[in-house]
Structures are given as C-alpha cells and as structure tokens.
C-alpha cells in the first residue's frame, strides 16, 4: 500500500512525514523544500504478530508495511504547470490513497502560502482543500476529455464504445462543475469504466487536520478542525485530528513505555501514526492475515473479501496455482484456548478451508499446495 502525503506549502506535511518515517526530510519555512518525493516504509503495528513471535521465537518477524510518499507542495495553477504542478500530479497518480494535510493552527511565524510564494494570507483550511481539489479536478477533466474523444472515435467502428463515451461525457460535466470524481454518482458497471481513467480526484482521501500542541487533547474545540470534519462528512471522506510536532516528539522516544507515558500525559490513547494506519486500512478496505512457524512469523495485507487461493498468491504465485487447502484458525480463537494452536485443534477450531473461503482479519493460516 502506498499513501501520498500532500498539502499546500507550510501546512506541516514534511514535519508529519518526518515523524512517521524518521526519514529526516528537509522541513523549512519556505515553499517547495520537498522537490523530489521522499519515500519511507513504515511497519504496521500488530500486537497479534508480536504475540506469535513471542510464542514461536522465529528466525524472522516480518510485519506488514505501508509506503508513505512525501510529495512536493503545490500552489494554485498546478494543473497548468505552476509551481511544481506537473511533477506533483504525476507523483499522486502512483499512490493508492491521498493523505491531505490541512493546516488547522495559527502561527504568525509560519506564513500561509496560497497563490504564490510571496503571498501570506489568513489560515483557511476549507480554502486550502478547495485549492488542491480544483487542481486535481482540472487535471482529471483534461484526462476525461481525451477519453471522450478516444471512445467517440472508437464507437465509429464498434458501437460498444458509445456507452463509454456517454459515461465520460457525464463525468466531464461533473468535473467541470468543480466536483471531484469521488462524488460522481453511477452504477457498478459505469464505475468500472470510470476507474480505467486512473483519475486523481477518484482516489480515496484522508484529511489530516494538523493542529498546534496547545489544546490538541481537546481538538473538538478547534474551529478549523470542525470545519474540516464537517466537509469530510459531506464528502464521505475520512478526517484525522493530528499534531505533527507532537508526532515528531513521540517518534524520538525509543522506549515503548516512555511513549505510552508521554501519550497518557497528553490525554491521547494512540499515536497519530497508529491512528493514520488504522484509518488507511479502513479507507481502503484492507485486513491482515498471519503466517507462523519457527522460520518466520509474518503479517500479510489483503483486501476484504479475498478468497484463500488469492491470499496464498500474496505469498507466492506457486502456492496460489497449486492451492489444496488452507488450515485456518483465527488469532482470537487461538488466544481463547490459552494461546495454543494444539489446544484449539483439540477443540475442533482448526479448520480446513477450501477455494471459496473468504479470509478474515486475524486469520492464522498454513497453506497446503502442490505444484
């Protein structure tokens, strides 16, 4: 899974990326300090995997991972190439989802950049969101208009392309009204047509409302946050309250107990990274299954609804091709039996599942195959 972190200059985007990945991306009070996208691979925290590793003492413990990409800040006019627009838009296209960092704090020492590097205006999270949304929409409109032309031309030789042309014409009108592809209403078949265009404004989005340290524990009182939350609710998007500076402080604490105490003192249950990862999984409809043994304990990420052979294919294509069965027990069932697979087997909880089995979150699986 690859998440692109985007935002206008000076909203705290690179500070958040630094905290998440400890990659040390340059962060400064001027636009475009991130010119090439910085990439960081982050392990997905999973207490179930930790427990299995404690039980089996494997040679290797391998968590699931998320790739975060810190994409250069953009300004108004990016879809026409302003600022670092074209590079920015192409980098977004390579991601699975967008984390849009939105400034929800006041600080007179950090200028709020909108139209160009010299302009400093009052903080306006909804205006910032609109600026980036419009750039994505305008880039998509250009792409969709090309698809209309292509489908219309193809329909002269094959009438099946007529419907495709009509779908893209309707989508073009939707985009031209300033609305994102995410909000385009259509049925499942037409959605499949739309998805072939690889549109930027169709990508799932999380608004990361970046607030100051003061009062973060009571983020609901932040008027900027509330405005972003209400917008996300109307769009059906996700919103995540976060404080990038606090996340940076947390990232510098190596001791897990020290981190827990730091969070408790702030009245925060989970770090922003943990909440962002969970939010990302929910947004993209992802779950994890586990493989276990003396050689390796590992977490694997799959889409909800994935059947056993396709889950096996995540490990190796030969296992999917030669799939026989999946010996399965859910982690919670195993723990209810005293943390013993043998005890769970005695109780008949270790199941032999076939090709139609839909893998569940937390399933511990041993795949039988023959090639």
Please identify what each model-predicted range represents.
Residues 2-6, 11, 17, 145, ...:
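C-terminal-of-GTPase-core extension/linker across diverse P-loop GTPases
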Residues 24-32, 39-41, 49, 63, ...:
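Generic secondary-structure boundary/loop-capping signal
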Residues 74-80, 118-123, 130-136, 155-160, ...:
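Flexible beta-alpha connector loops of hexameric P-loop NTPases
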């Amino acid at each position: 899974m690859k998440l692109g972190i985007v935002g206008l200059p000076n909203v705290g985007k690179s500070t958040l990326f630094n905290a998440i990945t400890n990659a040390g991306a340059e962060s400064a009070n001027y636009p475009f300090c991130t010119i090439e996208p910085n990439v960081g691979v982050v392990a997905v925290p999973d207490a179930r995997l930790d427990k299995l590793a404690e039980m089996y003492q494997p040679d290797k413990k391998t968590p699931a991972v998320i790739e975060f990409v810190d994409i250069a800040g953009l300004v108004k006019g990016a879809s026409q190439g302003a600022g670092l627009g074209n590079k920015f838009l192409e980098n977004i296209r390579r991601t699975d989802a967008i984390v849009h960092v939105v400034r929800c704090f006041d600080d007179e020492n950090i200028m709020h950049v909108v139209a160009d590097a010299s302009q400093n205006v009052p903080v306006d999270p909804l205006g910032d969101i609109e600026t980036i949304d419009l750039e994505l929409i305008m880039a998509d409109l250009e792409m969709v208009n090309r698809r209309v032309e292509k489908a219309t031309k193809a329909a002269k030789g094959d009438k099946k392309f007529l419907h495709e042309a009509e779908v893209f014409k309707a989508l073009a009108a939707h985009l031209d009204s300033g609305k994102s592809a995410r909000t385009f209403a259509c049925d499942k078949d037409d959605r499949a047509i739309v998805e072939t265009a690889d549109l930027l404004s169709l990508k799932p989005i999380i608004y990361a409302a970046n607030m100051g340290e003061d009062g973060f524990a009571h983020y609901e009182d932040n008027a900027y946050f509330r405005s972003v939350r209400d917008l996300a609710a109307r769009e059906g998007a996700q919103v995540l309250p976060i404080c990038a500076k606090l996340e940076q402080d947390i990232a510098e604490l190596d001791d897990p107990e020290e981190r827990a105490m730091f969070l408790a003192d702030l009245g925060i249950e989970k770090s922003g990274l943990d909440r962002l990862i969970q939010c990302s999984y929910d947004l993209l409809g992802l779950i994890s299954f586990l493989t276990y043994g003396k050689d390796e304990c590992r977490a694997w990420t799959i889409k909800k609804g994935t059947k056993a052979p396709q889950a096996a294919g995540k490990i190796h294509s030969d296992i999917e091709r030669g799939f026989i069965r999946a010996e399965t027990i859910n982690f919670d069932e195993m723990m209810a039996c005293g943390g013993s697979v043998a005890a769970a087997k005695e109780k008949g909880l270790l199941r032999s599942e076939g090709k139609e089995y839909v893998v569940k979150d937390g399933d511990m699986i041993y795949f039988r195959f023959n090639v």
